[in-house]
């Protein structure tokens, strides 16, 4: 090679479209807990765990526990007048090896127990939680994120008890925590990300943030309201 010689380099980029399956309540029976469980069982048998699954749920109430298995999930609620997609039992998300779940537009109404039991990265948006012992918990290898959600009258609203996670989402924006025993309980949480509660409101909770793990938390742009006398 001499000075002034030109070297040409090239790369080949291969983009593969990832297949996904989508179910709409207008086309697929999912009006009852039994129908939804039957659908989930068929998905586990027939759909690869590498295939994302998107569910558009009707505005009905599902009683009993529901388990979403090892997939990337998009689970979307709906409304019809005063009716909203609602779960009254524990919803478990069990994605493995990087599979995660997104849930949006759903109400979780309980009188004890756990609302969302996450074993994978779980992203909650525009959801409501009322009446649970623990509204949403991140178990080991999991992370729970919430944005634009309401947590009312739960013993614990958000709980973290995870020593590792396949994904993180540290922005907890525009949530409302009202009348909970503990709004946010951090027992164990991996990583160094700062949990940002900008735009979130804490009102009339016995404890706003119980940070046992001493994880970094930013509440500078959160709102803290006390009960009026």
Predicted regions and their residues:
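All-beta strand scaffolds that present successive hydrophobic residues in beta-strands
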Residues: 74-77, 100-104, 122-126, 143-147, ...
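Extracellular/surface-exposed low-complexity segments
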Residues: 18-22, 33, 38, 202-205, ...
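C-terminal edge beta-strand
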Residues: 5-17
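Acidic Gly/Asp/Thr-rich repetitive segments characteristic of extracellular carbohydrate-active
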Residues: 20-56
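A short beta-strand micro-motif common to beta-rich folds, especially ectodomain repeats
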Residues: 1-3
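Short glycine/acidic-rich loop motifs that flank beta-strands on beta-rich extracellular proteins
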Residues: 62-68, 84-93, 97, 110-118, ...
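Right-handed parallel beta-helix/beta-spiral solenoid domain characteristic of secreted/periplasmic
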Residues: 28, 34, 73-115, 126
């Amino acid at each position: 090679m001499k000075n002034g010689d030109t070297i040409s380099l090239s790369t080949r980029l291969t983009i593969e479209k990832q297949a996904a399956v989508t179910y709409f309540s207008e086309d697929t029976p999912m009006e009852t807990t039994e129908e939804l469980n039957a659908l989930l069982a068929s998905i586990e048998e027939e759909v690869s765990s590498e295939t994302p699954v998107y569910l558009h749920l009707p505005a009905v109430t599902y009683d009993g526990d529901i388990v979403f298995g090892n997939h990337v999930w998009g689970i979307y609620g709906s409304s019809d007048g005063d009716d909203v997609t609602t779960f009254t039992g524990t919803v478990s998300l069990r994605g493995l090896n990087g599979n995660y779940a997104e849930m949006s537009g759903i109400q979780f109404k309980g009188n004890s127990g756990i609302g969302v039991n996450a074993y994978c990265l779980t992203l909650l948006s525009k959801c409501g939680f009322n009446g649970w012992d623990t509204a949403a918990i991140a178990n080991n290898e999991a992370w729970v994120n919430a944005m634009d959600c309401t947590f009312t009258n739960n013993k614990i609203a958000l709980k973290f008890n995870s020593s590792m996670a396949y994904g993180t989402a540290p922005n907890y924006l525009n949530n409302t925590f009202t009348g909970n025993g503990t709004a946010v309980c951090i027992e164990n949480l991996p990583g160094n990300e700062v949990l940002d509660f900008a735009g979130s409101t804490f009102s009339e909770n016995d404890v706003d943030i119980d940070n046992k793990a001493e994880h970094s938390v930013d509440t500078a742009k959160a709102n803290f309201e006390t009960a009026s006398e």
